[in-house]
From Swiss-Prot:
It is an enzyme of class 1 (oxidoreductase). This is NADH-cytochrome b5 reductase 2. The gene is mcr-1. One of its GO terms (biological process) is ergosterol biosynthetic process. It holds the Pfam family FAD_binding_6. It catalyses: 2 Fe(III)-[cytochrome b5] + NADH = 2 Fe(II)-[cytochrome b5] + NAD(+) + H(+). It comes from the Eukaryota. It comes from Neurospora crassa (strain ATCC 24698 / 74-OR23-1A / CBS 708.71 / DSM 1257 / FGSC 987). May mediate the reduction of outer membrane cytochrome b5. Its cofactor is FAD. Its EC number is 1.6.2.2.
Length: 343
């Protein structure tokens, strides 16, 4: 019998062509550089920001000098025949990347494409990892730092894409939405998250809310682009309205291609009248129905979303490096801390 429990299918069944395109200050450590090439990724996507924060841009001669220094810093360490990686971690420091393209995705979300220092460079990110953005508001004493998960292909050369939702009062997301092509942003990485390898678990479940789909999509894409990876995936994705569902065409395409291994369940707080999916919030009854049972061996539940959702489902993290106590619905359903990972 299939591991996937029958439930209301998503309304997003029509496949669309996949495009190759498109607080307080916290301390984040980047991962040291590793050898080898990045994995080949076939499906394109946009990238969703994890949270909002403030902004500052560089212009004029200072920007040019900063960009030249970034290129020199990265390229002088490259050996012949090695794939160039923009983000190598360790003591690399910040790269000043130029905004190349801006695309309006919906009423509060934009896709931003930043150029890497060289056209034949890949980002250097792996699954699952993120980047850290920085800006210093005018007259502010401290810079604002915020992590984002690019889900442009890890093998894409010359650019990274961020899909950024604008949050009211969020200085970084507000600044990023105000940026124009040609302006620059300080970025570094990679920020290591959950190290994925093919068939690490037999079945994973991804519980996401809003822009929390970002690291989930990074995992999904890596799994289904690898013919050797047979992992089964269940996605539960909550949003306010249908318009807020990001990456819906990409997700529907994967589900249509792999119906026995990938199932997506969408939950809308304010659904349209014709909505055939789940309504309200992600709740205990839904998760009990569609998630793999906690008694099953070799499963993992990933959670990412706004603080209120995290508190209800799993409890929030204490810090970027501290998963915190497992609470909420997942604990009530009998999952152990080892079976749950909070992005």
């Amino acid at each position: 019998m299939s591991l996937f429990v029958a439930s209301t299918r998503s309304a997003f069944r029509a496949a669309a062509p996949i495009k190759r395109s498109f607080q307080t200050r916290r301390s984040y450590a980047t991962e040291p550089s590793k050898g080898g090439s990045s994995s080949t990724i076939l499906l394109g996507a946009a990238a969703v920001g994890l949270a909002g924060a403030g902004a500052y841009f560089f212009s004029g001669a200072g920007a040019a000098k900063k960009a030249e220094a970034s290129v020199k810093q990265v390229t002088e360490k490259i050996t012949p025949g090695e794939i160039k990686k923009a983000f190598v971690g360790g003591d690399q420091g910040w790269l000043s990347l130029k905004l190349e393209e801006v695309e309006l995705v919906n009423h509060n979300t934009k896709r931003l494409r930043f150029r890497l220092p060289e056209d034949d460079m890949v980002s250097g990110l792996h699954v699952a990892s993120a980047i850290l953005t920085k800006f210093k508001p005018i007259d502010a004493e401290k810079a604002v730092l915020r992590p984002y998960t690019p889900i442009s292909d890890e093998s894409a050369q010359g650019y990274i894409d961020l899909l950024v939702k604008k949050y009211e009062g969020g200085p970084m997301s507000t600044y990023l939405h105000d940026m124009a092509p040609g302006q620059r942003l300080d970025i570094k990485g990679p920020l290591p998250k959950y190290p994925w390898e093919a068939n690490k678990h037999k079945h994973i479940a991804l519980v996401a809310g809003g822009t929390g789909i970002t690291p989930m999509y990074q995992l999904i894409r890596a799994i289904f682009n690898n013919p050797d990876d047979k992992t089964k995936v269940t996605l539960v994705f909550g949003n306010v309205s249908e318009e807020d569902v990001l990456l819906k065409h990409e997700l529907a395409t994967i589900e249509n291609h792999y119906p026995q291994r990938f199932r997506a369940f969408y939950v809308l707080d304010n659904p349209p009248k014709e909505w055939a999916g789940n309504k309200g919030y992600i709740n205990k009854d839904l998760l009990k129905t569609v998630l793999p049972e906690p008694k099953n061996e070799d499963i993992k539940i990933f959670v990412c979303g706004p603080p209120g959702m995290m508190n209800s489902i799993s409890g929030n993290k204490k810090s970027p490096r501290d998963q915190g106590e497992l609470t909420g619905i997942l604990k009530e359903l009998g999952y152990s801390p080892d079976q749950v990972y909070k992005f």
